Amino acid sequence: MHWKHALIARVDARVHAAPVPLPAEARLAAIAPKDLEYLRVHVSGTYEGKATVLVRAATGLGTGYWTMTPLQLGDGRQVWINRGFLPAGTRVQAAAATTPSGPVEVTGLLRPTEAGGSLLQSNQPGADRWYSRDVRAMAQARGVGAVVPVFVDAQMEKGAPVPGAAAPVPGLTQIQFPDNHLTYALTWFALAAMSIMALLFVWRRRRWNG
């Protein structure tokens, strides 16, 4: 149980730390995804709005899409940015139209790629139907080169606003750690308490009948 609590504490520290630059390609390749996940980063560059992909999402705001757009960085790399949530019924052209033109700055949380699709459905690039944020598959489908193997869940975006466009809602990253060890411990305590109560009930009943 202690290791799980230590993990939660480490991730909590990353989420609330000051943002750092996106790690170099060599570091991204050398470090395990779990050691980079939820790292708070700051990136700047120019969006490739025409390459926007909509990925199915279910959030506290309802069902809809994550708005994934590649950001061209100054060092030549491209990183997919989850700009935020748009409601069901949004078309990819409308989502792309919300993309700021010119330089932008994004602060957010680093996330590992979600290869293949969701638990229930596989991505269908040919039909432009996406159920997970698979950075390499999206890059291949949109002709995006030099893409890094992670994406950024945007918390804040600074750029020229697009007049009349309803921008995606950022900052909806869900960080959950199901504490199974604690659940098991509570379950065993509950079972033990129920057993004791049952024994007491039987003992008292025998006394009354005795």
Predicted regions and their residues:
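Surface-exposed, charge/polar-rich loops and edge strands
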Residues: 1-210
